[in-house]
């Protein structure tokens, strides 16, 4: 692709952060966050593979099964869903049924209508598992509108972060009978910021509740996993200057959602109508390509090489060929600093999860090592995933662990190579020939072998 200008900006000195949504190919929707013309985050959703998990439906009970302590419900999809009795809020029980010792056959009857949320996707011949205890994920909080006893702080938040969040949450205002969970993205957020998120969730719940009461029969009320809505919820913040969308239907969806939850920033949602394709206009197609390639080049000539193994992801940092008279320590340190930025970016683009080990170029001076550690920390600050670090060890390795946010990019679009089974190597000609001769020998020794036929490549 074309060389990126070193300042990463467009010709007009454009440094605005933007969210770009490309949906011109009906089979795939792509989301990119760009800073000027530098791609900083990327996500894709393939038609027919959307998740239903988190979706909310109006459902009708079709069969009550006392032996399973559950009922089956029609929720508007092909197969009926499975709703265990313990997942049914007592607000849905028939009049006069004691909530304490109730049996499902007394509390629920065929034809009852309920509001349900998908907990587990359907798999194979099993229907989806449902619950009536809805949870709505916001950016910093999860609201449980009909579950008074579900609240707290995400288990992954520890120490003083936990205390601070609890204090902030005690200041929030919301109706009785609801509860809240703080998400990890809420760490370090003030009570007003949390309240802003909560107000959006309360509005959303009102809208869902209203739609459920208004409509008849079984139907989808709220689609959790529409890429657009998730993107605005999880990525949008004040420093994103505009959201550009290149198809009408997705634009309408985003506009409607924004007007509903953040009317003051709704004008930032814009319909992109230029002749040049949206992603080409911001020169990010070739940057997306780097998210699929093993080697990623750095600005001053070095590169990083990313390999997946069973146990971990390894990232090797290589410097450019050293020219005479250059200071080796300085080259090493500069390459490592560039690598730190690129590694943080690739973690996000590829959504690398689990254990990641980086082999930096060896540096003698400890202040340079600290500087590289700090640079990586800063670069990962804007990551939505939770990341933990070690420092650079005496062998020049740095370990980090990163939470997985979604199925990895490569899982969605790549398969293991059927020839090498993912090792990247197959036997060379000589080795193959010898192995085949051994097999021929072994087969021909057997009593009942009349002839041995071997299919081999020409060279072998």
Where are these regions (language model features)?
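Interdomain boundary/hinge elements
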Residues: 150-154, 177-183, 209-220, 240-246, ...
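Conserved glycine-centered short motifs in functionally critical loops
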Residues: 67-71, 75, 79-80, 121-145, ...
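Extended, charged alpha/beta regions that create polyanion-binding interfaces
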Residues: 12-55, 141, 164-166, 170, ...
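Catalytic cores of large soluble enzymes that bind and process phosphate-bearing ligands
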Residues: 53, 154-161, 186-200, 217-224, ...
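Intrinsically disordered, low-complexity mixed-charge segments
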Residues: 1-51, 58, 62-63, 78, ...
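Loop/turn-to-beta-strand initiation segments
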Residues: 111-113, 216-217, 268, 312, ...
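Phosphate-interacting basic helix/loop segments used at nucleotide- and nucleic-acid interfaces
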Residues: 42-44, 48-68, 98-122, 161-168, ...
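Accessory, often N-terminal, substrate/partner-engagement and coupling regions
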Residues: 101-193, 197-210, 217-218, 222, ...
């Amino acid at each position: 692709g074309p060389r990126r200008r070193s300042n990463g900006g467009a010709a007009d000195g454009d440094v605005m952060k933007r969210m770009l949504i490309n949906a011109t190919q009906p089979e795939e929707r792509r989301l990119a966050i760009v800073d000027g013309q530098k791609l900083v985050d990327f996500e894709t959703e393939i038609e027919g593979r959307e998740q239903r998990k988190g979706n909310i439906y109006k459902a009708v009970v079709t069969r009550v099964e006392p032996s399973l302590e559950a009922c089956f419900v029609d929720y508007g999809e092909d197969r009926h869903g499975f709703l265990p009795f313990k997942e049914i809020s007592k607000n849905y029980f028939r009049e006069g049924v004691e909530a304490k010792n109730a049996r499902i056959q007394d509390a629920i009857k065929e034809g009852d209508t309920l509001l349900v949320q998908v907990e587990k996707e359907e798999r194979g011949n099993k229907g989806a598992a449902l619950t009536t205890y809805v949870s709505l994920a916001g950016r910093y909080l999860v609201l449980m509108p009909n579950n008074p006893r579900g609240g707290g702080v995400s288990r992954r938040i520890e120490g003083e972060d936990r205390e601070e969040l609890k204090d902030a949450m005690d200041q929030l205002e919301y109706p009785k009978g609801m509860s809240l969970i703080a998400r990890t993205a809420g760490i370090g957020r003030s009570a007003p910021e949390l309240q802003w998120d909560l107000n959006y969730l309360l509005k959303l719940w009102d809208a869902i509740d209203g739609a459920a009461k208004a409509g008849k029969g079984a139907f989808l009320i709220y689609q959790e996993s529409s890429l657009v809505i998730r993107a605005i919820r999880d990525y949008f913040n004040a420093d994103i200057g505009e959201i550009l969308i290149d198809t009408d239907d997705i634009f309408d969806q985003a506009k409607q959602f924004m007007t509903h939850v953040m009317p003051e920033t709704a004008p930032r949602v814009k319909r992109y109508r230029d002749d040049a394709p949206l992603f080409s206009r911001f020169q990010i197609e070739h940057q997306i390509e780097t998210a699929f390639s093993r080697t990623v080049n750095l600005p001053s000539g070095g590169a990083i090489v990313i390999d997946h193994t069973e146990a971990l992801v390894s990232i090797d940092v290589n410097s450019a060929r050293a020219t005479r008279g250059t200071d080796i320590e300085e080259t090493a340190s500069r390459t490592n600093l560039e690598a730190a930025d690129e590694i943080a970016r690739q973690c996000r683009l590829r959504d690398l999860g689990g254990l990641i080990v980086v082999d930096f170029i060896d540096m003698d001076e400890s202040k340079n090592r600290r500087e590289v550690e700090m640079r990586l920390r800063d670069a990962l600050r804007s990551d939505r995933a939770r990341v933990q670090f070690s420092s650079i060890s005496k062998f020049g390795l740095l370990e980090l662990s990163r939470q997985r946010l979604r199925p990895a990019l490569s899982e969605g679009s790549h398969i293991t190579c059927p020839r090498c089974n993912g090792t990247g190597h197959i036997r060379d000609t000589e080795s193959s020939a010898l192995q085949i001769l051994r097999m021929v020998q072994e087969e021909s020794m057997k009593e009942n072998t009349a002839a041995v036929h071997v299919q081999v490549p020409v060279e072998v």
